[in-house]
Amino acid sequence: MKRVIAGAFAVWLVGWAGGFGTAIAASEPAYPWAPGPPPSPSPVGDASTAKVVYALGGARMPGIPWYEYTNQAGSQYFPNAKHDLIDYPAGAAFSWWPTMLLPPGSHQDNMTVGVAVKDGTNSLDNAIHHGTDPAAAVGLSQGSLVLDQEQARLANDPTAPAPDKLQFTTFGDPTGRHAFGASFLARIFPPGSHIPIPFIEYTMPQQVDSQYDTNHVVTAYDGFSDFPDRPDNLLAVANAAIGAAIAHTPIGFTGPGDVPPQNIRTTVNSRGATTTTYLVPVNHLPLTLPLRYLGMSDAEVDQIDSVLQPQIDAAYARNDNWFTRPVSVDPVRGLDPLTAPGSIVEGARGLLGSPAFGG
């Protein structure tokens, strides 16, 4: 029965894609050539000089091991550093969650995301000013908002640490921009604008030239942090929506070795600090993942992907240049969103296995 459903879905999906006709330009496979040597990124991995990581986790969904995720995030980028978890009201994004469904012993952060981020920024700022070791601030998803605010604050702080004592790394920043694109919210709300959603109430930070080296780690097709440049491409929007659901949080548990060279871009700002983007490929298109789950063979779904991916990739401006386009799908080394730590499957098991759901 699952294969019947999968077959029907595949026929509909390919037919839907074909209905776009020539309105979606086809993109070509990536060409392994990059013009000229780019600036060198700040050292990560075993070369990292950070001795401590100030870790800020994402939105604390009821039932997930938030502290465990937060302590693991960025560990492959800074493997030799001890983790100092910066606690803040990370559950604000779920302040609307029905209390009857909260796991026993949990609490609810009844405030807006904007207030929670301000709280986290103050805590991070305090840790940075009292720290003595070279440090890296790491933000996973919502935690990246805290890093954005703190960088803007430190940019004009005469008591800020020296540039060689601190760096920032965001994983899946839902309000940020990066060398290969931008987040969903950044495409809607410019710097300084207010997000008027009741439980969010967050003001986008002004863009500043930070004195600190910065890394942005993003999953390809993650609709939160890597939204299409051309949202009229509905196929790409649908793919990004599924990508946001399954490939957003796992980005925090990847390492620099998961990123091919053409997916790393570094720029130098007016203050001499580097900003490096690491675009992590996925192992398959998120849009067709249900087909694999429903029983279609990888070979069959790969054929469908070969039809859909050029149309989806045409929605991203980074693919316009045939010589410099990055790799978005790597079946061998790409991120597997269903088996990585922080996956939606793992999160669902944690939630449904809680006593609130009879687990």
From Swiss-Prot:
User: GO molecular-function annotation terms?
Assistant: acyltransferase activity
State its Enzyme Commission number(s). 2.3.1.-
Looking up InterPro entries in the UniProt record yields: PE-PPE_C
- What membrane topology is given? Single-pass membrane protein
Q: What class of enzyme is it?
A: transferase
Q: Which UniProt keywords apply?
A: Acyltransferase, Cell inner membrane, Cell membrane, Lipid biosynthesis, Lipid metabolism, Membrane, Transferase, Transmembrane, Transmembrane helix
UniProt key word Protease = no
Q: List GO BP terms, alphabetically.
A: lipid metabolic process
* Residues of the PE-PPE domain: 79-316
Q: One Pfam family for this entry, by name?
A: PE-PPE
Intrachain S-S bonds: none
Q: State what the entry records as the consequence of deleting this gene.
A: Mutant accumulates DAT in the cytoplasm and at the cell surface. Does not produce PAT.
Name the source's superkingdom: Bacteria
Report TM segments. 4-24
Where does the record place it? Cell inner membrane
What controls its activity? Activity is probably potentiated by the DAT/PAT transporter MmpL10. Inhibited by the lipase inhibitor tetrahydrolipstatin (THL).
State where it is primarily located.
membrane
One Gene Ontology cellular component: plasma membrane
What does the further note read? The topology of this protein is unsure. According to PubMed:25124040, the C-terminal catalytic site is on the periplasmic side of the inner membrane. However, PubMed:25331437 authors conclude that Chp2 has the opposite topology, and that the C-terminal catalytic site is on the cytoplasmic side of the membrane.
Family to which this protein belongs: Belongs to the mycobacterial PPE family.
Describe its function. Answer: Involved in the final steps of polyacyltrehalose (PAT) biosynthesis. Catalyzes the transfer of three mycolipenoyl groups onto diacyltrehalose (DAT) to form PAT.
Give the protein name, as stated in the record.
Answer: Diacyltrehalose acyltransferase Chp2
